[in-house]
Amino acid sequence: MRSFALKLALVFFTTLLIAMSAINARATYGAKISVDEPQYLLTALSLAEDFDLDISDELDEQRYLPFHELRLNQQTIDLNDSGQRISPHDPLLPLFLALPMGLGGWLASKIALAVLAAVTAVVTLWVAVKRFNVSANIATAVVAVLFASPPMTSYATQIYPEMPAALALITSIAIITGNTTRKAVFALILALTALPWLSVKYVPVTAALAVFFLYKNWNSERKETYFFSVVMGISAIAYLIIHKRIYGGWTVYASGDHFVNGEFEVVGRNPNLAARTRRLSGLLLDQQFGLIPWTPAFFALIPAFAFTLKERFKETFLLVLCAVVGWSVATWVALTMHGWWWPGRQLVVILPTAIIAMAILAEKFRAWRWFIYLGGISGVIAWLWLALEATTDRRTLVVDFYETSYPIYQALADVLPDFTDFEQSALLSNVIWLTGIAVATILTITRKTKVQKGLPLVRYETRTQTLKIQGTKSKLKISKQVFEEH
């Protein structure tokens, strides 16, 4: 137990230290903190000083100048005759940042987010080991290296709700896969309620988690599921009423100056869903905004999920469900994949599930293990490299990050497809890479995992757990995989 506590501490401080390396990096050449980030900080400042969401006085007094030297795009409109202005962003992140922003400004806010990212990494490691029975040593290495790589470390200090949402999601998974007690149900309600209040885009993954919880417990814990359903229903109604009352619409976008023709324009005026389907692979492979060029370890993402479904479907289905829902939102709902932000933003919320799946894969296959380690280390170096460039005014985190001089990124970008290019060469490159991933996936799921010769294996299965005992009288290897239903 003490050894595992040390591993948790190692992951915490590794995540925190790597995240802090970019704390002074510039988002753009005109601002340390830019785009949507100032909106969250101004709202946090208003909550700290005025105890309300109205940022009109903060905008008039240019309270953003310490972190945004240029004139700020206000993003909001007058909501009434008194000139009230409320940022078109959900309020839970500003509420979390209100205390650090009030006490220490933008720097304290970034530190608070970095600490929260470290906590998210710790919870992810705990879930991997305690809920999915991954080797503590391997899980520690995988979680540490991937939380220290983009995009996880990128959003550890950038002021967005992505990392708090990832914490809410992995906490929900920890609760759902454990015992269904009244305290656990209360905790799950809090975690799930937090997600939409961080951003309305997390409603689909919230619904997926809630439905899975009800499916898992409907027959065995009827009383708890009734209670859960009623409270979550009340929470949803309250969410809509409060948004209608404060923001003038069903979502925060009703107060935004970009959506004066309708709040649901946030997904696009005439979204071409067929064209957006290209993002299914683009989110992984795009030479600028994909996961793989920055952290090559994510080449293992699809093989990892395929392997977990094949080998441990019942246990890992929740991981895959969350990943599929989150990936679908990033593909078909998000306005764009190429935005004014660091790559992978829309995926951060579900990447803890991918990291756990990759840890399971690394435990079973040595080749994949070292690939994930080395690909993750490349991601760590990429971030440290760019953080130094962005801190010394040679590059920025959201304008020209793809012009970094980091050689491994540049080498991969040269051979990966550009999803802003609709020519045949980009399509061919996409097909080649997808074929490579498909081949790697097939080889992974068709290869039998090795069992040591000469050691008998006893396997005992019930509806809720699997117990494997393997070895001799002098040495036993016991593994227990549990899906609690009580």
Q: Which residues make up each language-model segment?
A:
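Interfacial juxtamembrane loops and adjacent helix segments
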Residues: 49-101, 256-274
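Membrane-interface alpha helices of multi-pass inner-membrane proteins
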Residues: 44, 142-147, 175, 184-199, ...
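Perimembrane helix-loop-helix junctions
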Residues: 177-178, 204-237, 241, 302-312, ...
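Short acidic/glycine- and proline-prone juxtamembrane loop motifs at membrane-interface regions
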Residues: 154-164, 290, 343
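Transmembrane-helix motifs of polytopic, lipid-linked glycan transferases
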Residues: 108-133, 167, 171
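Transmembrane-helix signature of polytopic, membrane-embedded enzymes
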Residues: 124-150, 166-167, 181-187
